Design a protein with these regions (language model features):
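Residue-level marker of beta-strand positions
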Residues: 57-59, 77, 91, 116, ...
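Short Gly/Pro-enriched turn/cap motifs at secondary-structure boundaries
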Residues: 7, 18-19, 49-55, 105-111, ...
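Local beta-strand N-terminus motif with an aromatic residue
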Residues: 75, 161, 206, 228-229, ...
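Glycine-rich beta-strand-centered segment in the early N-terminal region that forms part
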Residues: 20-34, 45-90, 132-134
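NAD(P)H dinucleotide-binding glycine-rich loop of Rossmann-like/cofactor-binding domains
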Residues: 86-167
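Mid-domain Rossmann-like dinucleotide-binding core that forms the NAD(H)/NADP(H) cofactor-binding site
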Residues: 135-214
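Glycine-rich cofactor phosphate-binding loops and adjacent beta1-alpha1 units
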Residues: 156, 199, 204-280
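C-terminal hydrophobic helical "lid"/dimerization subdomain
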Residues: 3, 243-247, 289-339
Length: 339
């Protein structure tokens, strides 16, 4: 079978591998659509394991079922989560599934940029979701990234009327925009240095878009009646953006850190100011089964219309081109690889 083999961000090759064989409780998924995630381009992290097949935003059709699989059959349209929890550890039992060691070590094989994917029994049991005909394979690739966004906003308990500043208008920032709108947030303002991203944010309904090179704090106060933001969501990994978040949050407000930085980056927090002003800093990583299920329901109900975010549709044979487009980030939001 054909796979997209990652060597580095500028070298992703179409190669041949043996089609995986499945065992009891497993399924073989024929990939129909697979999204390129921004984390796929975190070269400092990925290159340590290269060469490898990436891709974790996957939907497809079941090609084979292993012995003992009862809830799924050949031909079913499904989304499959790459990370699934044990549901028995102290983290899972307190609702913190994304801290589970099992979740951090599970995966499917070889990765989403392949014609066929072996889904282990644990992922079949806890991470496989049937797609109704009303949800396309393309929309199915958004379940995982939307679930991550949903978990983040659930963690900070976003409320009606809250002002929100989203730092970074790439795919995660725009998903935060769409979800915050559906959750009843008040003014939503967004920043970026990419004019294409800013224009997309404006088209999708952001109250204001601000070039990150300009006076973000001044522009924020001008739009938000002199106030800073109740919730600041960091969706860009530059250390300058995190420092901007410290300046942009209103008293008793919250900063949601949704993006990693390069290794070794540190953040200097004015502790006394944050203590006096009761500022909360919260991080959010990944998604759990509940988040995936809720994301699917939002897509089924068309409450979050993700099709507007797809800028490029490419075949598996164009995987290298897809990574190039994402890395350059000139006029792209979401690149979908199709079989």
């Amino acid at each position: 079978m054909r796979v997209g083999m990652y060597y580095n961000n500028r070298d992703v090759r179409l190669e041949e591998m043996l089609k995986p064989k499945i065992g009891p409780g497993e399924i073989l998924l024929k990939m129909k659509a697979s999204g390129i995630c921004g984390s796929d381009l975190m070269e400092w992290y990925r290159i340590k394991k290269a060469p490898l097949v990436l891709g974790h935003e996957v939907s497809g059709e079941i090609a084979e079922t292993g012995e003992g699989v009862k809830n799924y059959k050949v031909g079913d349209r499904v989304f499959v989560a790459h990370h699934v929890p044990c549901n028995t550890c102290r983290y899972c039992l307190t609702g913190n599934h994304t801290a589970c060691q099992t979740l951090h070590t599970t995966n499917f094989y070889p990765g989403g940029f392949a014609e066929y994917i072996r889904v282990p029994a644990l992922n079949v049991d806890r991470g496989t979701f049937l797609l109704p005909e009303s949800v396309s394979f393309e929309e199915g690739t958004f379940i995982e990234p939307l679930a991550c966004v949903l978990r983040g906003q659930r963690t900070v308990n976003i409320g009606p009327g809250q002002s929100v500043l989203i730092l970074g208008s790439g795919i995660s920032g725009l998903l935060h925009l769409l979800l915050a709108q559906s959750m009843g947030a008040g003014r939503i303002m967004m920043t970026d240095i990419n004019e294409f991203h800013l224009n997309m944010a404006k088209e999708l309904g952001a109250e204001a878009v601000i070039n990150a090179k300009d006076d973000v704090i001044g522009a924020l106060r001008q739009v938000n009646e002199g106030r800073l933001a109740d919730l600041v969501i960091v969706c860009a990994g530059a250390s300058t953006v995190f420092n901007q978040a410290l300046q942009a949050v209103e008293r008793s407000g919250t900063i949601l850190c949704f993006a990693p930085t390069a290794p070794g980056e540190t953040l200097n927090v004015p502790v006394n100011d944050f203590w006096r002003n009761q500022i909360k800093i919260i991080h959010s990583y990944g998604s759990g089964p509940r988040d995936n299920a809720m994301a699917l329901e939002l897509l089924k109900a068309k409450r979050v219309k993700v099709d507007r975010l797809i800028t490029h549709r490419l075949k598996l044979g164009q995987i290298g081109e897809g990574f190039r487009i994402m890395a350059e980030s000139k006029d792209s939001i979401k690149v979908i690889i199709e079989s």
